[in-house]
Amino acid sequence: MELCTILTMKLRMEGNNIRLRLKKSDIEQLKKEGIVGETVAFSDNLYFYYKLKTNQHDQEINATFVRNAVQITLPLSIANTWMDTEQVGIQFTLDSGLIILVEKDFPCKTRDDEDKNDTFQELALNNC
């Protein structure tokens, strides 16, 4: 299992869709390390992992599920454009029909108790 720094990336799965939402700190880690991920512990010996990785050799977005781990891999050029601009998200449909959406995390105006220091406030009005 490939190790990665654990931050606060969010995973949402609905139907045949996977959505990852990254905060600013997650994106900084992805730029620095090339990978960011989270672990969900169901018990002492049962874990579920989800990871987002960049790869300079890949030409297409890819998703795998191996050893209890969902891994989304973005070509480095696509990831860099998204990370370094105001582009909100990347959406891609795999041949299997799986829809992948990777997006920047914005605060929701309806959650007054949410810590909004690590979200992209400047674009939030158009994306919640």
Descriptions of predicted regions:
Residues 2-5:
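Short, positively charged and aromatic/hydrophobic N-terminal segments
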Residues 23-43, 82-93:
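Extended intrinsically disordered, low-complexity coil regions enriched in Ser, Thr, Gly, Ala
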Residues 34-56, 120, 125:
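A low-complexity, Ser/Thr/Gly/Pro-enriched, surface-exposed linker/loop concept
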Residues 11-13, 18-22, 70-74:
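Short, structured motif recognition centered on aromatic/hydrophobic residues
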Residues 59-94:
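Mid-chain, well-packed structural core segment of small domains
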Residues 46-60, 64-65, 102-114:
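A short, charged
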